[in-house]
């Protein structure tokens, strides 16, 4: 049994955290009378906090990131060796791991050819927005500058990224936002907006309706998550992606797929969009790229887009005038290369697909026993269970009760997630995203823990 190196006296560490650290997405008032959780070590899918408590992590680091699990010495050693050789040079020049990772990544993404490095998913998405706007000014006379985004999707935390937030609570109080960002309807059939057959095609038609309302010549790009993450783990219905792709080609609209959560194996394929046979113009990724072992994000595009920034080399405003300081840090691509190798050599895409089927089957079994589960959805190790107060009416379960289920699981030693501060009244989906290394026993323990929590909720 692994013994975590728990500090002899955790009190000073916890006190320092309480006194000086501002935690993400957290209300700190409770920490005036209770301790914040401070983690000290992880191994595989297990975590230990500063008090010595052990947890099974079904969230991959809380936000779909630690896809390889904790304590991978091979990744750490690859990063350490690269940092000794060359830790950094600005992205205006190249580095060995930057070149090698771009080549390896593009080999997984037929039809795409160029990789632009930055640090976070928010940045990666903003790079696309800037590219689209520059293309608008230089090639369309200022037209085709609008960017469409979908309800319930999330694309980052900067002001421009929040302008494309389909999650009202994430954007509230942070406006006013820049102009030129327009929402399209979501595609969650469980909470259908139309009574029809072929719901996926109807949801795609709704995008075309927005395009025609705004004017096709005004729209340059459509940004979508292949599977919506924090908005409820939404897998688009059959027929959706094929029609969306057709609509974008019909109106000469660039298709930007935000793979920050889905990318690098989370769904059982290298990228979520590859389940649907579509060809994007931009793909952005971050979390799973280096599996949390280094900060890196990528904006990947086609040679056709790349060429638009080379057409007038004598013009000092022709090229993409953007830089991301730590996009030049070599730890990111070094960790990403090793992550790619591990996924391939350890068969983690196959494991993710198989364990994802088991996780979905277990959740559907729970739904047979717990009426509070209204819908189960997901792909690979990217799953959700929406909780309801009434299955017939689909009335959402009170959000406090959803959080009580999450807390109960943590008390049992399993960390799960739930949609939160996203959609008013609909932050009711349990989110499960164990590492791609998950075993059958770990999958079963996760769902057994949820089962026990739901039984207590019913009682």
Curated annotation (Swiss-Prot):
It is found in: Cytoplasm. It comes from the Bacteria. PROSITE patterns: AA_TRANSFER_CLASS_3 (PS00600). GO terms for cellular component: cytoplasm. The modification N6-(pyridoxal phosphate)lysine is found at residue 287. GO terms for molecular function: pyridoxal phosphate binding; taurine-pyruvate aminotransferase activity. Belongs to the class-III pyridoxal-phosphate-dependent aminotransferase family. It catalyses: taurine + pyruvate = sulfoacetaldehyde + L-alanine. SUPFAM superfamilies: PLP-dependent transferases. Pfam families: Aminotran_3. This is Taurine--pyruvate aminotransferase. PANTHER family: AMINOTRANSFERASE (PTHR43094), AMINOTRANSFERASE CLASS-III (PTHR43094:SF1). Pathway: Organosulfur degradation; taurine degradation via aerobic pathway; acetyl phosphate and sulfite from taurine: step 1/2. Catalyzes the degradation of taurine into alanine and sulfoacetaldehyde. Keywords: Aminotransferase, Cytoplasm, Pyridoxal phosphate, Transferase. Its cofactor is pyridoxal 5'-phosphate. Its EC number is 2.6.1.77. Induction: Induced by taurine via TauR.
